[in-house]
Amino acid sequence: MPTLTALAGTSAPAASAASAASADTTATLAAADWPSIATELDAYGCAPTPQLLTPQQCGTIAALYDRPELFRTTVDMARHRFGSGQYRYFTHDLPAPVADLRRALWPHLLPIARDWAERLGRPAPWPDELEEWLERCHAAGQARSAQILLRYGPGDWNALHRDVFGNMLFPLQAVIGLDAYGTDYTGGEFLLVEQRPRAQSRGTATPLPQGHALIFTTRDRPVRSSRGWSIGPVRHGVSTVRSGRRHALGLVFHDAA
């Protein structure tokens, strides 16, 4: 797959390459075993996709971190007691591969989200088109981009949290590993902790393969109980990076307040 193109003033050959890359990602997601992904989400609260980005594409996206004009804000996690490390929120003028990845994932995540809502007896307010849903977020006062690029060095970590910014919420999100686990960095596993009904919490640690997305629960999910379906609250974070540098791309399907 081709490399990332510029945000503006893209040449015709580069624009054609970007279009081909987007088509490749869409085709890969269309060919993925979504029933198995849904089953794994039901079992663990997270599930990996096939490889969506080449190592070259991953490196190009990771390098965007050093272009501050692409971001609306930078968060120092230690300063806010969120952990250690940094992340940056993109502006709404998303780089094409970031926008394309989110748009390509939406139609596959939407049926799972609607199914979860039905199990929990909740409304499912999400339309077929992502753009229409984001317009509703903006009308409700959630109008800031929530797409993030994260950078961790040795000793950095991310405290358990939820990416919830208001009442407008999509129950699934994705994170894409941009560096090679075990080669570019060690440690830094993705953490998911689920509070189980009348039981101790369950934790899951998942390495992020380079170029793969991990789909996971945003706030809570349906879990089997003696009464049918119960709400399983979930938080996520990142374990301590032991060595190297870890970049990840976070894709959230609602905007921030």
Task: Identify the residue ranges that each predicted region occupies.
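Catalytic core of Fe(II)/2-oxoglutarate
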Residues: 170, 181, 185-257
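Short strand-connecting beta-turns/loops that link adjacent beta-strands
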Residues: 54, 154, 243-244
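Histidine-centered catalytic micro-motifs
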Residues: 158-165
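Short, conserved beta-strand element in jelly-roll/cupin
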Residues: 151-153, 167-184
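A short glycine-rich, His/Asp/Glu-containing loop-to-beta-strand
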Residues: 47, 142-154
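A structural signal for short, well-ordered beta-strand segments
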Residues: 147-149, 174-176, 249-253
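Non-heme Fe(II)/2-oxoglutarate
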Residues: 36-134
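Fe(II)/2-oxoglutarate
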Residues: 1-43
